[in-house]
Regions:
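Nudix hydrolase/Nudix homology domain
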Residues: 2, 137-213
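Acidic, metal-coordinating catalytic segment for phosphate/diphosphate chemistry
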Residues: 2-50
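Short, charged/polar surface micro-motifs in flexible loops or helix N-caps
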Residues: 45-53, 61-64, 77-78, 109-112, ...
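Conserved Nudix-box catalytic region and its N-terminal flanking loop in Nudix hydrolases
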Residues: 50-93, 97
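Structural detector for helix-capping/boundary residues
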Residues: 74, 88, 101, 169-172
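Active-site segment of metal-dependent pyrophosphate-handling enzymes
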Residues: 96-154
Length: 213
């Protein structure tokens, strides 16, 4: 067990003003003394015109030099199911509005540390799969701007500050970017995306990542 302060935090990784850094309505200290939350995400894939995955690229709010790519999603609201949260977050972050019948899974269950510059958190996530057919992919492209970016009108002020891009990443381009040093979460996403494009086998992949960005 880590040493925790009287207010329940691990002082090595969590400053006493952590509630000013994170939204305390979403995050609560867990048994490790870390801010923790439950979240839901969507791995959005398309087959045409080229196999691609929809990714957000963002940076550390205290260090713009640290960046990573990840799938749309976020923390669950009180009383919200993971499917409801995944659909809401997808709509807010991308403008893509799907229904529960458009999702498969959860396909991945992930528990991970996020070591930001100022605070380390834990997030327990469920990932759902959305394989967009030609009609759904066209609907997604309809909300894309002239710069190739997806709709960002639903982003919060904080998201506008720390999220840098939202676009389709062709899988070959993603492989090259990761090979050149880009960090992607989950780390297995490039290979996982290729496998899920061929179909989901019904098995939930469990991922535990410690000490990550």
């Amino acid at each position: 067990m880590p040493h925790v302060t009287d207010d329940g935090r691990d002082p090595r990784r969590v400053p006493d003003n952590w509630r000013e850094i994170l939204d305390p309505s979403e995050w609560a200290l867990n048994h490790e003394g870390l801010p923790s939350r439950r979240a839901a995400r969507v791995i959005v894939l398309r087959q045409m015109p080229d196999p691609a995955v929809l990714l957000v690229v963002g940076h550390d709010f205290a260090d713009a030099g640290r960046s990573w790519a990840f799938t749309p999603g976020g923390g669950l609201r009180p009383g919200e199911s993971p499917v409801q949260g995944a659909l809401r977050e997808l709509a807010e972050e991308t403008g893509i509005r799907l229904t529960g019948s458009d999702l498969e899974g959860p396909v991945v269950e992930r528990s991970a540390h996020f070591a930001f510059n100022l605070v380390t958190c834990r997030q327990d996530e469920l990932f759902y799969l959305a394989r967009l057919d030609a009609e759904l992919a066209a609907r997604a492209d309809a909300v894309r701007g002239q710069d190739g970016q997806m709709d960002r009108s639903g982003w919060t002020p904080l998201e506008c500050d720390v999220l840098d891009s939202l676009r389709w990443w062709p899988l070959d381009e993603l492989d090259a970017a990761v090979g050149a040093g880009m960090v992607v979460h989950p780390q297995a996403l490039p290979a996982l995306a290729r496998r899920l494009l061929r179909g989901w086998d019904g098995k939930v992949l469990t991922i535990r990542e410690e000490g990550g960005d």
